[in-house]
Amino acid sequence: MSNNSNKRAPTTATQRLKQDYLRIKKDPVPYICAEPLPSNILEWHYVVRGPEMTPYEGGYYHGKLIFPREFPFKPPSIYMITPNGRFKCNTRLCLSITDFHPDTWNPAWSVSTILTGLLSFMVEKGPTLGSIETSDFTKKQLAAQSLVFNLKDKVFCELFPEVVEEIKQKQKAQDELSNRPQNLPLPDVVPDGELHRGQHGIQLLNGHAPAAGPNLAGLPQANRHHGLLGGALANLFVIVGFAAFAYTVKYVLRSIAQE
């Protein structure tokens, strides 16, 4: 018997999986897309986009479903291929919707139901056979690394060209952001005629420092001299004013005495 005949699924499984495929295309599962192998409808591959507000945000997680020839009367096995920090890679996962628990399997469950259950368990932290424990930091690192990892997978690229393009666009945006020159500090600009201090305590006029030269170093000393001169003049004006007032009073008193 040839390999192709070994891979040929029974009519019941084929019909059911075709129906499930049409259902997924019409009503996609949130965050997940799935495609069967063109050569074997019993092997499906899926991609989970990491949901927002989770450690998996920004990541792309590739895995596969292996359906038995008795599907839908027996459950499939589920594998995760992309390193993710939640499940072991290329290991059968023990979930209530997999072949680890045929006693809890419901033939009415579709491929959409299976993938929804997988995503639900992925964002939880409950342990199971095939799961691992890692920190959120590690999961975020793996999410960032998943882009490059998946682009190296031939099956991934063949089955999910739209996702591949999405990843490449995201990588391009990240590269442009990282290569963008840092913004230079803006000059200190103030209204015309106003002085304020810029960096290193240098006074700026209209947002510009005075031209470099011998006078620049003497600015603080010159300002100090101007302050002393102004204070002396103010004291002199007070003394002169007081003397004038005293002379006026004396003159008035003398005039009254003569009368």
Curated annotation (Swiss-Prot):
Can you give the residue ranges of the UBC core domain?
Answer: 12-162
Q: What is catalysed by this protein?
A: S-ubiquitinyl-[E1 ubiquitin-activating enzyme]-L-cysteine + [E2 ubiquitin-conjugating enzyme]-L-cysteine = [E1 ubiquitin-activating enzyme]-L-cysteine + S-ubiquitinyl-[E2 ubiquitin-conjugating enzyme]-L-cysteine
Task: Give the active-site positions.
Answer: C94 (glycyl thioester intermediate)
EC main class here is transferase
Q: What cellular component terms from Gene Ontology apply here? A: endoplasmic reticulum; endoplasmic reticulum membrane; ubiquitin ligase complex
| Annotated coiled-coil segments of the chain | none
- Task performed by this protein: Catalyzes the covalent attachment of ubiquitin to other proteins. Seems to function in the selective degradation of misfolded membrane proteins from the endoplasmic reticulum (ERAD). In cooperation with the GATOR2 complex, catalyzes 'Lys-6'-linked ubiquitination of NPRL2.
What is this protein's record name? Ubiquitin-conjugating enzyme E2 J2
Q: Which organism is it from?
A: Mus musculus (Mouse)
What gene is this protein a product of?
A: Ube2j2
